[in-house]
């Protein structure tokens, strides 16, 4: 059985609020860590979210 192409990752806020999103990414095409700007409702503004592993 083959290994799945997409894996689940956690996008954690850089504003140190503890807020995070869970999303999928294709590990074969996106080898580097994902950094994306999204809305943090605790900080009430758009901040960068960095990829971390789901524990």
From Swiss-Prot:
Keywords: Ribonucleoprotein, Ribosomal protein. GO terms for cellular component: cytosolic large ribosomal subunit. The keyword Membrane does not apply. It holds the Pfam family Ribosomal_L33. GO terms for biological process: translation. SUPFAM superfamilies: Zn-binding ribosomal proteins. Transmembrane segments: none annotated. InterPro entries: Ribosomal_bL33 (IPR001705), Ribosomal_bL33_CS (IPR018264), Ribosomal_bL33_sf (IPR038584), Ribosomal_zn-bd (IPR011332). Coiled coil: none annotated. GO terms for molecular function: structural constituent of ribosome. HAMAP family: Ribosomal_bL33. Belongs to the bacterial ribosomal protein bL33 family. This is Large ribosomal subunit protein bL33.
């Amino acid at each position: 059985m083959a290994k799945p192409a997409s894996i689940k990752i956690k996008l954690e806020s850089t504003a140190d609020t503890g807020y995070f999103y869970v999303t999928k990414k294709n590990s074969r095409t996106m080898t580097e860590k994902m950094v994306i700007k999204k809305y943090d409702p605790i900080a009430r503004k758009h901040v960068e979210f960095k990829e971390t592993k789901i524990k």
